[in-house]
Every structure is written in structure tokens, then in C-alpha cells.
Regions:
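Alpha-helical transmembrane segments of multi-pass membrane proteins predominantly involved
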Residues: 1-185
């Protein structure tokens, strides 16, 4: 995930630092490499058997287990397919660095969703995945249908987030915990 985060933040900065506009295939290749490296790391974890619970802020909100790893690989493959499928499309567009950066940042959220063991972390990860996709939906700023789609997607996402928060609050009220394992028992 650190690879995706560093590259995702670096792509627009590299674009700004370069004097001439970089080609979309350059930024796409960097994003592709970061995604391949992330899949390689997850597979390396499986091969070493170093799958152990991860803790953030001394709370078990992420579990680095085989189930999460399998879905993390699936999500990263989806991000790779999106990146590869965007090469030709982005040749005609400006700011391809931002486009590929948003794909990587969304992939981070997808991987966090896969490893999440807490409802609050699941919600935060879902939002981390969703917010870049709202921007991607409205990427074609001058196209009215793109703007309309982004607005509708954002409003639908905001309503969905409110419903999810309401459901999490009910689950917490009934069980006294937001841990998924404790909530389902």
C-alpha cells in the first residue's frame, strides 16, 4: 500500500516538475509498475507465510489474512485492467498523471476494504475508494454529461454513506462494538 500511496501522490508532482507535458503512457507505465509491485508484495506475503494481524492505533481494524489477501489481489487486478484499458483513452487527454494517480489512490481504498475487520475502518476505506472515483466520473470537465454523471454519483454516494453510518450506529448500539467479528455473533 505504501507503494501505491507514494506513487499516487508522486505522479502529479512529477508532472508539475517536468517542464514539458509528459506522455500518458509514461504515467500509465509508472502506475502499472506500482500495481504490479503491490500484487508482488501480497503474493510474497503468502509465500513467506508471514500473514499476521496488523494493528493500527492499537486497535485491530485490519487483518492481513488469506481472505483479505485474495480480495486485495482481485482489486489490484481490477486496477491494473483499468490502467491498461486507459492507455489509449488518455493519449487524447491532458493531466494523465492526475488520472492515473486517482486510480492508484482508489486502489488503496479497495485494498483497505479487503483487509478491514472493523465497521468504521470499512467505512473509511470505502470513502477512500469512492472519493477518487467521484473525481474520475467527472474527469471530462467540459463534457456536460460527465459533470452530470459525477454529480449524480456524488449525491448517490452521499446518501449511501449516510445510510451506512446509520447502520453502523445501530450495530454499535446493539452490540457495543464495531468489530465485524463481534457484531455478527
Amino acid at each position: 500500500l505504501a507503494i501505491l500511496g507514494v506513487v499516487g501522490i508522486s505522479l502529479p508532482l512529477i508532472n508539475i516538475a517536468r517542464k514539458e507535458q509528459g506522455s500518458s503512457s509514461f504515467y500509465g507505465a509508472i502506475a502499472f509498475g506500482a500495481l504490479i509491485a503491490s500484487i508482488g508484495y501480497v503474493i510474497y506475503q503468502f509465500a513467506n507465510g508471514s500473514i499476521a494481524p496488523a494493528a493500527i492505533f492499537s486497535q485491530d481494524v485490519l487483518a492481513d489474512d488469506a481472505f483479505g489477501g485474495l480480495f486485495a489481489i482481485a482489486m489490484l487486478i481490477v486496477a491494473i485492467m483499468t490502467t491498461v484499458g486507459s492507455f489509449n483513452y488518455m493519449k487524447k487527454q491532458k493531466n494523465s498523471a492526475v488520472y492515473f494517480s486517482l486510480i492508484l489512490l482508489s486502489a488503496i481504498g479497495m485494498v483497505f476494504v479487503a483487509y478491514s475487520t472493523d465497521l468504521v475502518m470499512l467505512f473509511v476505506a470505502w470513502e477512500l475508494m469512492s472519493i477518487p472515483t467521484y473525481i474520475l466520473a467527472g474527469y471530462m470537465k467540459k463534457d456536460p454529461s460527465s459533470n452530470e454523471a459525477a454529480l449524480k454519483y456524488f449525491l448517490f454516494g452521499a446518501l449511501s454513506s449516510a445510510i451506512i453510518i446509520y447502520g453502523i450506529s445501530i450495530a454499535y448500539g446493539l452490540t457495543g462494538s464495531t468489530n465485524i467479528g463481534e457484531v455478527i455473533q
